[in-house]
Amino acid sequence: MRKGTGIMKTPKPLLALRMVFPLAASLIVLLLGEGIARGSLSADVFASFIFPHIGAYLLAWLLLFLVWLLLDWVFRCPPLSTLGMAVLGCAPCAVNFYTLQLRGEPFLPWDLTQVSEAAGVASAAGLKIQPSMVVAIIVVLVLMAGSFFLYRGRHKQRWLPRLAGSAATAAALCLLVFGVYLQPAVTQVLGITPDAWMQDRYYRYYGVITGFMTNLTNLEISKPEEYSQEAVDALLDNVDESQKFATSPLYSTSYSAVTPKDEQVKQPTIIYVMDESYWDVSELEQYGITFDTDVSKNLHALQQTSAYGRAYSPSFGGGTCDVEFEALTGYSVSFLPSGSKPYQQHVTKPMFAMPNYLKLKGYQTAAVHCFWAKYWSRDKAYPNLGFDDFISLEDMHGVTKVRKHYWTSGLVTDDSMADQIIQQYESMKSSSDKPIFLHAVTMQNHTNYNKDNYPDDERVKVLSHPAGLKPSTVGALEDFATGIRDADAMLGKLTEYFSQVDEPVILVFWGDHYNPIDSNYDVYTTTGYASDSSADPRLHQTTLLMWSNYNQQQVDLGTIAAYDISPVMMDIYGLEEPLYFQFLNRQLRVASRTNTRGTTMNLDGTTTQEPTEFQQRWSAEHWLLQYDLMFGRGYALQRMGLAGLSGVDTGK
């Protein structure tokens, strides 16, 4: 007892434990959270992810420690401080685990604007609590109980020291958030490198807390310095002038090149199908892998009488909506902050897009997607892009679902999606004489892959493969190849149906992105197909087909950017292009095949990370027009007859 005070002096061992507890508890919570996010924590996780990027985890540890300290200064209730810190450390990790399951992307800051929608989707999807979450709850309860007994009898603090302690801790927290987390120059010094390709990998490397906090920098858009009405008008004047002297379409064998203009179809039905994770996996047969069936027989047959090539995707392993956004608009996500999601953050008002433009030309429009309407905010983004109707999973009845080993509720098959597309087409045809634009997005072949997703008698089998592939990887490849076989059957079903309708139809079919198979790159590296880098250009060129029931010209498209899918389709079929699409086709003709996420593909198909000044100028002009149409005053809209879509200037 201190002399004259009546206060018992705290024993040194107890004092030491009280000082160590918040540091230890915050470290334990950090590890619990990472275990939740990853499903488990193994020695390999520490060796491959945590230790090589230790700076990111030290920042997260410091953040949790300061949160505990601030709560303790304010409430002087250690169990409450422990609970608050644990919720902050573990809840985002649990959300991250489920968002990865549902959409292949981690928990991002802008998801906070959709809490109620996400809760509804999670409930409908039948998500289950994981063992790692149960362990975390038990450990947190033990920590809370421990803090109660450890700090019991601690003398009360007067209000002035508490106020000073609270202020100092809050200041330290602000310094950490605004002076470190939100300063890319500082985080890069700590070894935290932005990853434009794959947010999932970014979170695996740097952890959920640091990944989430650093993504807060991706909320604002910077206006191009040269942006003005004069600059936009001058650029569009140049496009207009160039078109007057254009001597030929992009491709010499295309329908528009070989068919007299007065004989060309003016308003065909246009159907887009973006197939989940689709690329022609039979290409691996050139690299030592053989399958027990021809997984792409319809594709290969149709390539003889269609326009075919590759779409350069901005995504790998996830980010389906990024690819969809590019294809529907001609906008490049490369100009947007790394990790941002256009549908959630930017498509918040009507804007120029293929559906809105076609509506101006008299089309009726609809979208079909066999997942929940609210995910990726499609229910809000689609109307702003110009879709009159949206048929989502909630509206589908009697559809077949597969792959229930990983996806508890199953995924709608591509065959059922073909039926949905045909039904929607027939419904639109019967209700209106207007031409149709119908856009569909599938789900059957979504990651993750496991041989148990299909019965043995339904799954494509790998007959031979290079040495070094693990059995689990071979099984995952069989799962993936089965999805490709079924996507090919869907393609055959659709082209067979639309070849018999009595009106002109264009069908554009492409894959959104590649994925890791069995959570690794072994299929690509062991065969020599590609490297183990998600930035490898080979892993961004998905299969693309443009077919019509009124033209049999074979056209080799080569590789084009996903944002060029709509402009190129309109060019090869001789459809009236908006000025913005004319600009994109001009860029494709003279500058580059794509400029995506730091990779430029030259006109000859070679790639570089160092574009020429000429290519950089075209890219800058692309961003100028995109900024005007997405965020600016919409000066270009007047020139395209879409002045009604013009909104107020916004940079956020």
PLM regions and their residue ranges:
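Short alpha-helical interface patches
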Residues: R103, L112-G120, M133-V135, G211-I221, ...
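Intrinsic-disorder/low-complexity, polar/charged segments
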Residues: S40-V45, C77, S228, G319-T320, ...
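Membrane-interface segments at or immediately adjacent to transmembrane helices
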Residues: G179-Y272
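Transmembrane and membrane-interface helices of multi-pass
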Residues: R2-Y203
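Intrinsic-disorder-associated interaction segments
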Residues: K9-P13, Y202-Y205, S228, T473, ...
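Solvent-exposed soluble domains appended to multi-pass membrane proteins
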Residues: A246, L250-K266, Y272-D275, W279-K652
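Generic structural signal of hydrophobic/aromatic residues within well-ordered alpha-helices
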Residues: L32, A118, I209-F212, V232, ...
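Alpha-helix initiation and N-capping motif
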Residues: L112-V115, Y205-I209, Q229, S296, ...
